Structures are given as structure tokens and as C-alpha cells.
Swiss-Prot record:
InterPro entries documented for this protein: T2SS_GspN_CS, T2SS_protein-GspN
Protein name as catalogued: Type II secretion system protein N
GO biological process, one term: protein secretion by the type II secretion system
Function field: Involved in a type II secretion system (T2SS, formerly general secretion pathway, GSP) for the export of proteins.
ATP-binding found in the keyword field: no
Taxonomy of the source species: Bacteria, Pseudomonadati, Pseudomonadota, Gammaproteobacteria, Aeromonadales
Amino acid sequence: MKQKVLIAALFLVAYLGFLLVKLPATLVVRHLPLPPNLVQLEGVSGTLWSGQVARLQYASESLTQLRWELNGWSLLRFAPEVSLRFGDRSGLNGQGVVGWNGAAFGRDITLNVPAPWVLDRVPMRLPFPLTVAGQLQLKVDQFAQGNPWCDNLYGNLHWYGADADTPAGKLPLGDPELKLTCIDSRLVAELKQGSEAVQVLGKLELQPNRQYLFQGTLKPGPELPDQMKQGLPFLGQPDGQGRFPLRYQGRI
């Protein structure tokens, strides 16, 4: 008798789960407690299991063609995860898998964005006019949220076709790369950049207490603008290979 009750209960739970994921996305969105002046959704279609939003507006930012696919098996593991895809090739776009198992996690994440789009959203005022060119691509193989930054992280940030135009001249940067890892809850980014104008190598560490430290070197190249070369002595004395020391620390 107990076995029959257990089987019936399992079937009931499975049926209720089926009904839940088949809920129309428009019905779910209608009952979400979204702040009306901050978040707006347009063109919602599909179901809770699989659907899309033509446009998601958050404050002054927006995402287009947001699509999702809920992993049903992940619900049985009590670690729901969803595959996301959004944007178009002309602007911000990306895809990946994100979820929650007591903390946020993600894998196979790719994010593409034009470099000028990022510069326009830098929160601090720059001391001089600056324009940039190129395309940024973030790839995250694995990520697990920690306290406060991360427990696990393997990824890379590339800046393809990187160029910067400053009052001191145009600065070709090649294709800079950041290798992203997490070590003992510290967010670590290793920078490797090289061009005919300048070569920069270094490591940035962000501590759990929000302290950061960047240490590296800068080696000028033949195409470095003369006005920029004049400022190199302020960095200190170069080593035997012509590399100037870089060190910045502070708190965010």
C-alpha cells in the first residue's frame, strides 16, 4: 500500500512539474514583482520551459532577442539551470548556461561587445578624451560564486583589433588578453598585451576585502607616440630589458 502511495505521489509531483514548466511565459511575467519604472519586457512568447523576450529594458540599458531553455533534469537535482542566448551581431550579444545551487554558477558563457560600448559605460570620468576601437569577447568555461567574488573561475577576456586614440596620439594595442582565475577566493587576472607600440605584462588580484593590487611591466616599442615616450620616466627606472615597472593598488 505504501509503495502505491509513493508511486502515486511521484506521478503527481511529475505532473505538477509538467504543468508548471508549460505555463505561458506571458502569464508568468504578468505576476513577476518587477519595478515598472526600472524593468520593462516587450514581445514575451513561449513557455516557462522555452521562450523568448523580444526586448528587455533595464533602466537605460536593453537586451534584444533574449531566449531561454530550462533544463528539466536540473530541477530534479534542486539546482535549476537555464540556457540563455541574446543580442545580435551588431551590438551586445552572448550565450551560456547559468543556474543556482545555493549560489550562482555558470558555464560555457560567451559575451561579445564593441569596445566603444564598454567605454561609454565606464563609471568614472576620464582625465582626457579617449576613443577606442575593437571587439571584446569574454569566454567563461566555469564559474561559481563565492564570498564575495568566486569559488571557481576559468575564463579569458580578449580585445580583438584593439586601438586607442588619445590627445598624445594613436596607440595600436594588438590583441590584449586577460586570463581569469579564482585562487583562494581571490579574483586573479593575468594580462598579456603586445604590439609595435607597447608591450604590457602583469597580474591583477582582487582580494575578498575589496583591496586590489596590479603589478607588471611596460616596454615601449618603436611605434609608441613621442609624447607618450616623454612620460615614461615617471614610471621609474627601466630594467636591463627596457621594461618599466607598473604597480597600482587601492580599494574598490
